[in-house]
Amino acid sequence: MSVEKMTKVEESFQKAMGLKKTVDRWRNSHTHCLWQMALGQRRNPYATLRMQDTMVQELALAKKQLLMVRQAALHQLFEKEHQQYQQELNQMGKAFYVERF
């Protein structure tokens, strides 16, 4: 074989090896991707359960907070009405009996 032919054969061999390496890398990454997807599918139910549990806890806390806010607003309303009632009685010359300590 001539030197030129040997060079061409060697170049084509190098190209073939480069292509083979590329295909091998693609296969490895594809296999890794499939493995990650399977792993994610196994982990996903647990993540969903944790997220649902967190949502339930947050909802319970939000309900409790809303209840406290509503109770405070109701207490303020009763205090305001009581003050108004006392003022009306004072204007009429009457008053509540208040025991002093």
UniProtKB/Swiss-Prot annotation:
Subcellular location: Cytoplasm, Cytoskeleton, Cilium axoneme; Cytoplasm, Cytoskeleton, Flagellum axoneme
Keywords, alphabetical: Cell projection, Cilium, Cytoplasm, Cytoskeleton, Flagellum
Gene Ontology CC: one annotated term: axonemal microtubule
GO biological process: one example: flagellated sperm motility
InterPro entries linked: CFAP141 (IPR029375)
The organism's place on the tree of life at top rank: Eukaryota
Quaternary data: Microtubule inner protein component of sperm flagellar doublet microtubules.
Identification of the protein by name: Cilia- and flagella-associated protein 141
Natural source organism: Homo sapiens
